[in-house]
Amino acid sequence: MTNNGNAITVEGLRKSYGDFEAVRGIDFGVREGEVFGLLGPNGAGKTTTVEIMEGLRPRTAGSVDVLGYDPGVQVNALKDRIGVCLQATNLPEKMRVHEALDLFAAFYSRNVDRNQLLKRLQLDDKRDEYYSKLSGGQKQRVALALALVNDPQLLFLDEPTTGLDPQVRLEIHKLIEELKSDRRTILLTTHYIEEAERLCDRVAIIDAGKIIAIGTPREIQERTLDKSIIEIECATGLPEETPVFLGELKFTLSEDRRHLSVKSSQPARSIVELVKWIDQSGLELTDIHLKRPTLEDVFIELTGKRLRE
């Protein structure tokens, strides 16, 4: 039985290593059947948080409920119901794909049909292949198969597409979307904003051990940044002296002063003023466009870093 319709409920979670507090009292819930993304720069505490939920690391304080179990004391009962796909899965070079599946299946009290699983993950023609002969994308599909061999209710995906080329990453995205259609609960950590926007129903942004935003990608964008972004390009550099109205807005200017990016809650008015200023300065406007802030913009605004830093 899960907690109030949540597959995962975390309350007041803390984890310390000596005097260093890696996780500083976080609270969140993951609903049954949703894909929940955990985003954060390196060292933010997301890996520690996930490992605590998986039962791989003890917590210092707080409570964690995963599918009705406390992973700190009931990990053996929990392991039959979760699947874990790590960022890097290394198997013996001479192990065949079907041998890896048979080995992992032996760890659990319940299994799926392995032949059907291989077919679903487009590995049926690789069942007798040595692990060392597989491509990077095929190895990642094997890692997914190993995480699914016990037909888990909850799947942990730790940066499942890191290091893969764009085409292979797209193939993995499609597989995850198929898993999502099963109404299986998935917790995803990723270093790719576009991956979170495409796959996640909701996301939490964690930084310095604390959750600083949570909601759907659109909710976070609208709640955190209510300003549009105006981007302007001129044939030559903009004047050294900026107008008064620009000083009241948040803006960035390229080193050669040809590219200007302005955040404004009144974009129509700001565009009129910007174009008027450029015209009065005798400059040639070569490009102008307006965009809403992306999840990447929000992430940078909240953490001061890009996700892959």
Residue ranges of model-derived segments:
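C-terminal coupling/interaction segments
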Residues: 267-309
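ABC transporter nucleotide-binding domains
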Residues: 5-10, 15-208, 213
